[in-house]
Amino acid sequence: EGFGGLRGITGEPDRMPSRVGISIGDSLAATYGCMGILAALHHRNQTGEGQIIDVALYESVLQVMESYVADYSASGFMRTRTGAILPKIAPSNVYPCKDGEFLIGGNQDPIFKRLCDAMERPKLAQDPRYATHLARGENQAELDDIIAEWTRTLTVAELEALLLAHAVPSGKVYDAEDMLADPHYAARESVVTLDDPDLGPVTMQNTFPKFSATPGSIRKHAPRTVGEDTTDILERWLGRPA
């Protein structure tokens, strides 16, 4: 993450670089490795030839760094840590509520007007400091303070219902407890429950993406001991005696 640049742009600007929160380099490398395998299989099917797939952790991180390198190469602009905001794009931030945090993306002019209506402050959208996309970007911190003062008076549920009614892109910042309680997660089977021999029922994320004809599934828990699945693989998958 550090070598690939991600750690350097993650966190608050006045603090040391922060971890993303998960071991994302490992997951990205596995994802690009899988993509490489699929592309190599397609090549093999066309040509009959195999090839070596070289996947580096840092290059997998580098691949998702958007225009980070190109920005610096072309103009000398070095992207830095900005915390939760998008610099000069406002409002687009996480705001405090009575009982949690809420993400609001109201930076486009029509959306910002609807946000002001939801706040019952329609004149705010006509204020020269906030009336245009560029003006809001120049007064980002001040505008965030105004919105945060308003969101603090509401619960997450109240704010969610209000902004949904005004068609303002927004959403609650979820944790695992929220995910397990959300009917959308259940309806799409985004999480599934498996019986673990040691832990009992364990709920976890399902397999993604979803396929209409050949849906994937989590069939069993991870092996507890080395070689636990050897017999099954040899006999059932390879047709060889264990």
Model-derived regions: residue spans:
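Aromatic-enriched alpha-helical interface/lid elements that frame and gate functional surfaces
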Residues: 90-166, 170
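Alpha-helical scaffold segments in soluble metabolic enzymes
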Residues: 33-40, 68, 114-118, 146, ...
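Flexible, small-/acidic-enriched active-site or ligand-binding loops
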Residues: 198-242
